[in-house]
């Protein structure tokens, strides 16, 4: 059993756990575990008012998993960062959209339209004032990039 985690997470774990099967996994690095390639993508807030949640300096990550040529991206808590927008050949993206911690519906649709996965699964879409409007997300995304298919899952 192997756990990949940023060093900042490992440092917060009890020593008996941290020294076991946890490998440091920082933004920009790639690791192979059991034939699956994991690439860490920086996950952070861009908006000044959101810096207290996920500043880039904290080292939070999203992950691209490559399993036999199928690429799946998990955004983590992030806005549409340059690193996210530069992703290529993503088959399925699992992207968070909940203000104030990540992105709103419009920003999420713009980010997804830019890196253009085949399928997008919205998650973590509860906001402080209820739920993000998934219908609006789908409408905006369809206008920007009709080639991306939205799959809704029961997240909450």
Regions found by a protein language model. Give the residues of each.
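Active-site HxH/HxHxD metal-binding segment of metal-dependent hydrolases
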Residues: 1-37
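Short, charged, surface-exposed secondary-structure boundary motifs
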Residues: 13-17, 32-37, 50-51, 102-109, ...
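Hydrophobic packing residues within well-ordered alpha-helices of enzyme cores
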Residues: 13-14, 84, 137
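Core dinuclear metal-dependent hydrolase active-site scaffold
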Residues: 24-88, 153-156
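Binuclear metal-ion centers of metallo-dependent hydrolases, dominated by the metallo-beta-lactamase
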Residues: 17-29, 109, 113, 118-156
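Short glycine/proline-enriched coil/turn segments at helix->beta-strand junctions
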Residues: 1-2, 15-20, 68-69, 88-91, ...
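Metallo-beta-lactamase
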Residues: 2-6, 32, 41, 61-115, 123-131, ...
């Amino acid at each position: 059993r192997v756990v990949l985690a940023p060093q900042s997470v490992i440092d917060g774990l009890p020593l008996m756990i941290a020294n076991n099967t946890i490998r440091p996994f920082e933004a920009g690095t790639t690791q192979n575990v059991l034939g699956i390639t994991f690439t860490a993508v920086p996950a952070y807030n861009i908006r000044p008012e959101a810096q207290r949640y996920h500043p880039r300096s904290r080292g939070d990550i999203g992950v691209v998993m490559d399993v036999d040529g199928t690429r799946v991206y998990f955004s983590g808590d992030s806005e549409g960062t340059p690193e996210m927008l530069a992703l290529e050949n993503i088959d399925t993206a699992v992207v968070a959209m909940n203000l104030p911690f990540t992105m709103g519906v419009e920003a999420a649709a713009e980010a997804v339209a830019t890196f253009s996965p085949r399928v997008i699964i919205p998650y973590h879409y509860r906001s402080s004032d209820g739920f993000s409007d998934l219908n609006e997300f789908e409408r905006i995304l369809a206008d920007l990039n009709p080639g991306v298919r939205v799959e809704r899952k029961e997240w909450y």
